[in-house]
Design a protein with these regions (language model features):
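Signature of alpha-helical transmembrane segments in polytopic membrane proteins
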Residues: 1-137
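Conserved hydrophobic helix-helix packing surfaces used for dimerization/oligomerization
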Residues: 141-142
Length: 142
């Protein structure tokens, strides 16, 4: 992995994780009128984060070339989001924990998450494109 790929992974990956956590806490607030998470919901949030990391690695969300079209990047992000939702649903039903968690909270989380992650991708890719056009990504060779 090149140094620039690691920076890109950190930049986009940390943004995704922060937004997933934001979406979860906002959905929790909308459902329960508090941001103080119960212990079982903290566990669910950790599962959300770890499964997103695995899904993003499966779909190579953080490695793209300069010629990738925005539609391709967004479609991969949507596919990863759907796969993430399927993994979370399967996991909750397999451990018989689906009764412990609010389905409305999970639905709110995914609605908010899809919106903010797609917007984040647009903003981040526009920033990266502007950064590259400005010439800051060139290495100085002596």
């Amino acid at each position: 992995m090149r140094n620039t790929d690691r920076k890109m992974w950190f930049f986009l990956g940390s943004g995704d994780i922060i937004l997933i956590n934001f979406a979860f806490v906002l959905a929790y607030f909308l459902k329960f009128d508090t941001i103080e998470l119960k212990e079982n919901y903290i566990f669910l949030l950790l599962v959300f984060n770890f499964s997103w990391i695995l899904v993003s690695a499966m779909f190579s969300l953080y490695t793209f070339s300069r010629v990738d079209h925005l539609e391709h990047i967004v479609s991969n992000t949507i596919k990863a989001g759907v796969t993430h939702a399927l993994i979370i649903t399967a996991l909750l039903f397999s451990i018989k924990a689906s009764e412990q968690f609010s389905r409305q909270l999970i639905l709110y989380t995914y609605i908010i998450d899809f919106i903010v992650v797609i917007l984040w991708r647009f903003v981040a890719l526009a920033f990266i494109k502007r950064y590259r056009v400005s010439g800051y990504n060139y290495r100085r060779v002596v």
